[in-house]
């Protein structure tokens, strides 16, 4: 069994930006289609956060920095997974 780490980037609801602004930012940063970005934005609004991407740490850090430049709150979480 092989142990691997994946990193998840969560976008948080901040209650100060409009839905349209956040959707546009998610489209820009994550390269999502509008419907997918809208779904992420709604999940973040309803649950307080939404996992918008997962992958290696450096990729998630780059996306996190892009969200920060747009004044959106995001966080990287590390998750262990096991492959058989």
Task: Please name every model-derived segment.
Residues 1-84:
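Terminal domain-initiation and capping elements
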């Amino acid at each position: 069994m092989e142990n691997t780490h994946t990193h998840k980037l969560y976008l948080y609801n901040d209650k100060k930006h409009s839905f349209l602004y956040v959707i546009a930012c998610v489209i820009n940063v994550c390269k999502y289609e509008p419907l997918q970005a809208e779904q992420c934005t709604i999940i973040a609004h309803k649950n307080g956060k939404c996992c918008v991407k997962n992958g290696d740490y450096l990729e998630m850090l780059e996306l996190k920095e892009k969200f920060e430049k747009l004044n959106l709150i995001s966080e990287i979480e590390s998750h262990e997974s096991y492959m058989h």
